[in-house]
């Protein structure tokens, strides 16, 4: 239950609700019973993630990109799983791996890249997404 509380506390209030229409604020109104119920469903194996609400977000080039908006409970479960997996695998990651890591950022990655380019011969750079 503590991890579900931690996961909930990391959710952003201003994000759009998912398919169920429930906001983080709505979920907070009955937080303790909601988290207890969620935990019981996880333990029983009856928790099922909901479909994401699909929104098309306009891009600068005039096209759109699809965005899936998860409901609050799914975000809580996803965040809890991230916290568990980070504890397990963080020790195995390379120090120069910056993507989606706690305490690491794209700005730090760019700074490190700048140092490498300035101090070593670089024959190629790969740009990947």
Model-derived features with residue positions:
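Conserved pre-catalytic core of RNA-dependent polymerases
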Residues: 1-128
